[in-house]
Amino acid sequence: MQVNNLGFIASILFVLVPTVFLLILFIQTRQETEG
């Protein structure tokens, strides 16, 4: 089965971008509550 390279990259970005965004929000809120 041949995988479309552009679709593969798009799917990775579609998963990575929200994950990184949530991680940044999570870290910022943790730092605010700690200090």
From Swiss-Prot:
Its main location: membrane. Keywords: Membrane, Photosynthesis, Photosystem II, Reaction center, Thylakoid, Transmembrane, Transmembrane helix. It comes from the Bacteria. Pfam families: PsbM. It is a single-pass membrane protein. InterPro entries: PSII_PsbM, PSII_PsbM_sf. The keyword Membrane applies. GO terms for biological process: photosynthesis, light reaction. The chain crosses the membrane at residues 7-27. GO terms for cellular component: photosystem II; plasma membrane-derived thylakoid membrane. It is found in: Cellular thylakoid membrane. PSII is composed of 1 copy each of membrane proteins PsbA, PsbB, PsbC, PsbD, PsbE, PsbF, PsbH, PsbI, PsbJ, PsbK, PsbL, PsbM, PsbT, PsbX, PsbY, PsbZ, Psb30/Ycf12, peripheral proteins PsbO, CyanoQ (PsbQ), PsbU, PsbV and a large number of cofactors. It forms dimeric complexes. Belongs to the PsbM family. One of the components of the core complex of photosystem II (PSII). PSII is a light-driven water:plastoquinone oxidoreductase that uses light energy to abstract electrons from H(2)O, generating O(2) and a proton gradient subsequently used for ATP formation. It consists of a core antenna complex that captures photons, and an electron transfer chain that converts photonic excitation into a charge separation. This subunit is found at the monomer-monomer interface. This is Photosystem II reaction center protein M. It comes from Microcystis aeruginosa (strain NIES-843 / IAM M-2473). The gene is psbM.
